[in-house]
Amino acid sequence: MKYWPIFVQIGLLTSCNGQVKTNNPGDQNKAVSTTEGIVYFSNDFGQSWSNQSNGIPGDVFLTDISASGDLLGISTKQHGIYLYDFVSGEWTPIKRNKPISPDIDALLISENKIYAGTQGEGVFVSEDRGESWESINAGLENLTIRRLTVLDNRLYAGTNGGLFSFADEQNRWVRAYGNDNLQVNGIALLDNEIYIGTNKGAYKATLNQHNWRLILPDRSLHNISTADGIVYAMVYSELFASKDKGENWYGDQSGMPVGMYSFQVVEAGDIVLDGQWDGVYRKDNILNWVKLNTGLPIKIPVTEMRVWKNILVVASSQWCK
């Protein structure tokens, strides 16, 4: 069996009374190296973990993870973007030159470009690892960015006002689907079909066409993903799954806490992993999930997971022991 290294990343570290935890309580901005950690790596499908949090301030609120080529990055709400240095084993902040905001909700690294989606200021791109930034908002009708991804060599942005795709030939965004009231929280691809998870349900269409249709009504989704040929819809009380591309759905919560929702579902090699409110779960069979928290702090809401170079990166925010 092939093994895939795994990173787990934990965002804003809070105690149960809401106070930020650092090694020195008097220095909220000091880079942390605590038993709780902010980032964890695993080389054995989550069976064991090592804390790899050097360089990240203790008061960060992590928002996203992205990786491509030799770059692995995290975005935050206060401190901008950090890149991981595999030589030093530390996270280093990239420059926050104007006009980019330090308040970043969506991060995408693709073909040596870094895209940052902000809350209210649209999308920025850097082609020199953050030395300089350019705003790319032409045609973008909503500047609050929820998600950034590339599908079939085209850049997509999920916003608080619909799904947009970037037309390189025109150097501007065009609305792919939705209206000013459609919040797009997740974007996924399966067999040449694009899926979006929104505040008004799940929709799908053939890639690069406009034959959108509602496939999961009466549900508010905070994310959607595909893994092992299955579509996973993450609503605010349960995980739903579809084996027939959204035609039929079933609850897929067995083995995970009742009433607690999943943040992410990803495929790593021949296994499927779920980021839940209390840690990481592995799909044991078609009907059950098994917890994989050996070596991790207790009660970690794992909000982000990404696979990169045989590595899985997982993130969280606002947790307590």
Predicted regions, residues:
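Bacterial N-terminal signal peptides
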Residues: 5-14
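An edge-strand/N-cap motif at the start of beta-rich repeat modules
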Residues: 17-58, 65-67, 72, 86, ...
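Short coil-to-beta transitions that initiate beta-strands within beta-rich domains
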Residues: 22-26, 53-68, 95-110, 137-151, ...
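Beta-strand initiation motifs
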Residues: 47-50, 88-92, 131-134, 170-174, ...
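Loop/turn residues immediately N-terminal
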Residues: 37-39, 78-81, 120-123, 161-164, ...
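Conserved Ser/Thr-centered positions that define the repeating blades of beta-propeller domains
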Residues: 42-43, 83-84, 126-127, 165-167, ...
